[in-house]
Amino acid sequence: MAELWLAQKSIILYNRKVLLIQRSNYASGENDWEIPGGGLRFGEDLLEGLHREIREETGLSVYGEKLLYAMTALVSPQRQIVGLTYLSYADSDEVTLSHEHKDYVWASRKQLVELLNKPMLDDFEKHSILDILDID
């Protein structure tokens, strides 16, 4: 049976840095760096789901959410992901990671390019994300 999954992520800014979190062995992609977010639950409001995922993964509350872009990828013959990527701001840089992640960094532009995987960087390039972010 085919499956469609909606994932929401947010580029979270604090003091002109972007929060990256590193996956633990909890799920596939161990050691990959990513921006916070996750799946939307059935019946959940988009921003409520985004806030829930960010709180669960980082302990942060965010504000000023702006939808930056949407993407889709067929990850297997029976599974398609639709991704929404937002821009948000944090009031604090104090991160409390869940068991899904093992490390974090408030990344500069250089670190962002070095740490993120190619598909995410390709999405960022396609949507000119690095050009619109006010980061060091």
Residue ranges and their predicted role:
Residues 1-19, 70, 87-89:
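Conserved N-terminal beta-strand and adjoining loop/helix that marks the start
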Residues 2-4, 32, 76-82, 101:
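A generic structural micro-feature
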Residues 14-56:
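Conserved Nudix-box catalytic region and its N-terminal flanking loop in Nudix hydrolases
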Residues 15-17, 24, 89-94, 109-111:
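Short loop segments at secondary-structure junctions
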Residues 16, 38, 52, 65, ...:
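Structural detector for helix-capping/boundary residues
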Residues 31, 99-136:
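Nudix hydrolase/Nudix homology domain
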Residues 61-69:
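A short coil-to-beta-strand element that immediately follows conserved catalytic motifs
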Residues 71-94:
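Active-site-adjacent beta-strand/loop module that shapes the phosphate/pyrophosphate-binding cleft
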